Every structure is written in C-alpha cells, then in structure tokens.
Amino acid sequence: MGYPSIYPTGVTIYNKEKAYSGYTNFPSAKGAQLIDMNGNEVKLWAGLRRFPNKILPGGYVMGTTGARGGKYAYQDQLDLVQVDWDGHIVWKFDKTELVADPGKEPVYMARQHHDFQREGSTVGYYYPNGEPKTDSGNTLILTHENLYNHDISDKRLIDGKIIEVDWEGNIIWSWRASDHFDEPGFDEAAKNALFRNPGLHGEAGGDWMHINNFSTLGENKW
C-alpha cells in the first residue's frame, strides 16, 4: 500500500469504544479495496481506478478504468463506470468530449475528476435516507473543459465544468465556472494575478478555478 517504512503500517489505532464499526473503501495500487476494521481485505475490484471510488447499495462501485496521458492532460479520467460485485461494468459514460491530442487518434473521454453524484444521494454514496440509484437515474459529474476567456486570462484555461448525464448517457445540463467569474468577488489584485498566471500546468493550460467537490441541495423548507 505504500513505500517501505520503519513506521507501523496497516491498522495502527482501533478504539472499539469510539470507532463506528463498518467497512472502509479506499483506492490502492491494486484497485478499489474494501477492508474491515482490522485491515483485512474483504473485497478487491482489481484495476478499478479512483477519482474517487464510491460504493453504492447492492455491492456496486463507481470509478474509472483509466486516465488521459501526455502533456496536454491534467487529472482527466477516460470514463466514469459503475461495476457490480464481480467487477463487470453495468454503466459507463465517456462522451463529455472528443479529445484530439496531437499525435494521437481522437477518442471520447469523460474528463471526469474529483467528484460525481448519482441521483438519490447528495454525496454520491449511501447514507440513511439518501440512497443512490443503481439501475436508473441521472449522474452529476465534475469535468474539465479547455477554453479561452479573456476576462480571466489570455492563457488557455482548464475550466471546471459540472454536467448532468441521464442513464442513457445524454448530457442534459451543464454549468461552467468561467461563466460565473464575477460572482466569487475577486478584487483587482487577485484578477491581475490570475490573468498573469491562472495556475498554469504547461501545455494542459491554466487550472484557474480548481474544484474538488460539489453537492446537490435538499428542498428549501421555506
């Protein structure tokens, strides 16, 4: 699970009176791994990458099968998949964009990173009274889109984009961070700094508004 170390590895602290008993899913070098409270491997979905992995009711897991490579890539995943307990893909999305990197054949990709949510849950996985759907429903996916917006910078940008995808893989709604540049309240000094260097990552572009997660909101009782 890590580099050789003189420090203890595995489960190093387990206070049964204070720790809620259950299972932990985490990404390992081998794939999506499920362990018990003592660190014993309960299940391994070999080769299922993460960004992240989320367990759904019925023994399903969501993740990705691979990442975009090369100097034009920045954290882009090829797809978002749902696999069953045996690792068979039962749902897949990879049609955010047809990516044509120089010197490579064009390929459709999800360009997903960091977060996604399946309908029925505000976080993307099960919790009491919040059960994500496993055989239907829409999925919100955090993705990237390269563009130019001269209000932000004259450099090529890596924009944060949220898309909503139905069960058949159709994009039915989208939201881009760059369309809301005036809303965070950047002062002139911050805007000037962003314009000169919007978080550049070489040929991939400037990651000007790095988004890690999002959540849907419940109904407003007012």
Which residues does each predicted region cover?
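Histidine-/acidic-rich catalytic cores in large beta-rich domains
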Residues: 1-222
